[in-house]
């Protein structure tokens, strides 16, 4: 995991360790908020060969995953770069998990578990809502019945996560409000948990206090 401000400018340096040709699974909303070029420019500067898959309008469903998987195989990619929120990251995870398998997405949704080595997956989250980033199970929509199913993937499928705080700061106001509310709920849930400790309570209380400052429109989070 790489954390920090403007670390996305070095993403091309990181991905070079995993190959030279990639498929970039990107949330189309990033173009609207001016983040797409910010992420792709470092790849262009270091001549990283890539193509973009951004047809994510219907969520992480099996049809889009099947389409992305076919494009990845036809493009002989050596890795997947996922940019965006949970939707983009889940689709990219499914493609990486299935790339070297002889069966498809619907076999996995019906219970078949991938066993071959997954394609290297590099994630660049643009939100803090990434609960399945390092989880061997991801939720997907089965287009046959329009129901959410859990797909098992290989452990440690995400080889690298580049988390840049400036990407989150560029979100729309509605996205920021949604993320803030969910994060506040997580803090409250953790505080009330039976597994809570003195230290976890301290972090939860401090996070709730900081959110209070932020939601009140404070220019500074200094307490």
Language model feature labels by segment:
Residues 39, 69, 88-102, 134-135:
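Short Gly/Thr/Asp-enriched flexible loops that form oxyanion-binding sites at enzyme active sites
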Residues 77-93, 126-128:
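Glycine/serine-rich anion-binding loops at beta->alpha junctions
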Residues 100-198:
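A glycine/threonine-rich phosphate-anchoring loop and its flanking beta-alpha core
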């Amino acid at each position: 995991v790489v954390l920090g401000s403007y670390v996305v400018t070095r993403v091309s340096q990181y991905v070079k360790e995993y190959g030279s040709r990639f498929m970039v699974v990107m949330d189309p909303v990033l173009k609207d908020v001016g983040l797409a070029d910010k992420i792709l420019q470092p790849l262009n500067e270091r001549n990283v060969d890539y193509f973009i898959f951004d047809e994510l309008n219907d969520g992480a469903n099996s049809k889009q995953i099947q389409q992305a998987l076919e494009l990845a195989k036809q493009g002989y990619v050596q890795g997947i770069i996922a940019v965006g929120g949970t939707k983009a990251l889940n689709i990219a995870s499914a493609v990486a998990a299935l790339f070297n398998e002889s069966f498809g997405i619907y076999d996995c949704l019906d219970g078949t578990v991938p066993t071959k080595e997954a394609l290297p997956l590099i994630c660049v989250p643009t939100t803090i809502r990434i609960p399945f980033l390092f989880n061997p199970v991801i939720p997907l929509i089965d287009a046959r019945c329009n129901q959410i199913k859990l797909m098992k993937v290989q452990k440690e499928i995400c080889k690298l996560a580049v988390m840049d705080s400036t990407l989150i700061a560029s979100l729309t106001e509605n996205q920021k409000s949604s993320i803030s509310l969910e994060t506040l709920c997580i803090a409250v849930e953790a505080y009330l948990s039976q597994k809570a400790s003195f230290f976890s309570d301290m972090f939860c209380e401090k996070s709730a206090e900081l959110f209070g400052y932020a939601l009140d429109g404070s220019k500074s989070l200094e307490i």
